[in-house]
Amino acid sequence: MKITVLGSGGWGTALALLLLENGNDVTLWSYHQAESDTLRTTHENPLLKGVVIPEEMKFTCDLAAVKGCGLVVMATPSFAVRSTAAQVKDLLDPGTIVVSVSKGIEKDSSLRLSQVIEAEIGDKCPVVVLSGPSHAEEVGRHIPTGVVAAADDPKIAEQVQDLFMNQRFRVYTSD
């Protein structure tokens, strides 16, 4: 599946690697061009020391990378979730699954970040929350991890489960 991960911090990079290893076509989006260039040339994220990013990973600073994706992962810092969701709203294909993996709540509204995404993109795309006791460096180093994919529609949560899960990354579902 064509997937774009929005946010190239440690968590976004670790999940992009996981999705790539699971056989998907993955693009990792960075807000800063210099960051994207560094990832492309060094094949390492400074936040995940020693974890090699394969040549197959694509890098961009262009939000149009979400066009044609079956899945978009929102891994931006919490303060950037609303603005990023607003910018990609018109670029997303209807039905694209949007997975919220950023932790926290929005400062001014006290909304969960999944609610912020839903407020910005409306009902155009289903939103799934992927969360649990997990750390980027552990996922990047292939340490066994368990998380939950929660969605209003259990079938959508199961689709996310299928895309993310492997022998070391266990995904449970919830509605």
Regions found by a protein language model. Name each.
Residues 1-52, 58-61, 87:
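NAD(P)+-binding Rossmann beta1-loop-alpha1 motif at the extreme N-terminus of oxidoreductases
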Residues 21-24, 41-44, 90-93, 122, ...:
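Generic secondary-structure signature for well-ordered alpha-helical cores
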Residues 43-48, 115-117, 144-148:
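Short, hinge-like loop/turn segments at secondary-structure boundaries
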Residues 136-175:
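Carboxylate- and glycine-rich phosphate/diphosphate-binding segment that chelates Mg2+/Mn2+
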Residues 53, 59-67, 71-144, 160:
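Rossmann-like NAD(P)(H) cofactor-binding subdomain of soluble oxidoreductases
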